[in-house]
Amino acid sequence: PHLGASTAEAQVAVAEEASQQVLDILDGRPARYAVNAPLLTPETARAIAPYLPLAEILGRFFAQYSRGGVRTLTLEVAGELATHDATPLQAAVLRGLLHDASNERVNLVNAATLAKSRGITVVERRTPDAGAFSTLVTISGTGADGAVRTVAGTLANGEPRFVRLDDYWLDV
């Protein structure tokens, strides 16, 4: 929003727009004009947006499945999304991972910072080959029990779908 609004009406419009952006961020939607959030091309934003809920769900599941204590998390984006910036997907995974483990409200803007402060490192990989899927989002890491865990998902008719749990392929 333009911060130099010179009329009362313009100031109200700027305040409303800024407030709506804050609400969007707090609700987990991507920031449109944030200074401290990655700037995405409209094409990337359109491509990535449908996968943000999937990434967050995978992160939430992974936090429980790995029994916490994850220090290094690998995010692999395969298929059609591999050509796009995966930073928002990474943020959504971290938002899910930290959702129940943080006293702070975790959103797409602060998720990476909160993860870093907890000693969590994210390794990102992109590959054009998603096997039988057009796009596959996979996260893996070592939990507190020392076991390496892997979960993967995709979208089926626009809905998040779990398709892999460790070495098992499934359709949930």
PLM features: residue spans?
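NAD(P)-dependent dehydrogenase/reductase Rossmann-like domain
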Residues: L3-V172
